[in-house]
Swiss-Prot record:
Main location: cytoplasm
Name of a matching Pfam family: Gp_dh_N
Sites where the protein binds NAD(+): 12-13, 34, 79, 315
Chain's gene name: GPD2
NCBIfam families: GAPDH-I (TIGR01534)
Site for Activates thiol group during catalysis, residues: 178
Species: Mucor circinelloides f. lusitanicus
InterPro entries named in the record: GlycerAld/Erythrose_P_DH, GlycerAld_3-P_DH_AS, GlycerAld_3-P_DH_cat, GlycerAld_3-P_DH_NAD(P)-bd, Glyceraldehyde-3-P_DH_1, NAD(P)-bd_dom_sf
Reactions catalysed according to its record: D-glyceraldehyde 3-phosphate + phosphate + NAD(+) = (2R)-3-phospho-glyceroyl phosphate + NADH + H(+)
Assembly and interaction partners: Homotetramer.
Listed name of the protein: Glyceraldehyde-3-phosphate dehydrogenase 2
Annotated pathway: Carbohydrate degradation; glycolysis; pyruvate from D-glyceraldehyde 3-phosphate: step 1/5
Amino acid sequence: MVTQVGINGFGRIGRIVLRASLSNPEVQVVAINDPFIPLEYMVYMFKYDSVHGRFQGTVEAKDGKLVVNGKEISVFSERDPAQIPWGSVEAAYVVESTGVFTSIDAASAHLQGGAKKVIISAPSGDAPMFVCGVNLEKYTSDLKVISNASCTTNCLAPLAKVINDNFGIVEGLMTTVHATTATQKTVDGPSNKDWRGGRGAGANIIPSSTGAAKAVGKVIPELNGKLTGMAFRVPTPDVSVVDLTVRLEKGATYEEIKAVIKKASENELKGILGYTNDQVVSTDFVGDAQSSIFDAAAGIALNDKFVKLVSWYDNEFGYSNRVIDLLAYAAKVDAAAQ
């Protein structure tokens, strides 16, 4: 069964979700909506990418449609999600990747146009959040709007789950050293809600807030209230790294911690949580489809109950692959429930 998908918002995540969908035979993107990007420009934006390189397939505009690898994708340009005719192209599942419609109420507008399910590619204040490898078993087919959480939560949660399951986490602090994103300014500019966030992205390390660590408590209830965190935005275009410092319930050597993470990466979390012993740097992970790659050589332990763990993630590509994985999983559960 191939699940037909619509994408609302053809920005960084929307475009990379389309790229990711091409390597999953269970999913086919049949429509894209973006009121700000004309069709010819869509072709250009999809073909060329400063981070992920030139698209290694064919892309063209033909008869008002975007044609990728010979397959036609309908293009809409509605500003109001309720007006997008998803039903006319049988796009049952919609990826909401504008970054604007992130609540259940706002994202539900897609249902009026014929969509059956909406996956928000961002954290949500009220939509249930799912992280592949962590809490997918809690998904039920009656849910109409769900969230794939954030790229940072997708990196942190699998690591936190392994540590908590094996040793117990008493409490912890997370810092993500995070690549620049589209909401930042190229040079100093106005940003009333976040003064630091208005400073030039290319010239600064910018302290910022993130709800990623607290969100782990929503997908792993046992960790609710035990983790919080912050971010440093840095002048790199892609790939971020989580620094998780935790106090453990059960003492363990760093070697023992590495062993359980390696085991999980080869078994139940294969493809989600990676493991490396190499002397890696951020660009080594551009295009890595995993949610989180544990850097065994970078972590440190003060004693057997207080450790710092380091894990990398391609905040664009890894996350976009999980959006597709979550969607495909939901479609299977929904089909079985019918």
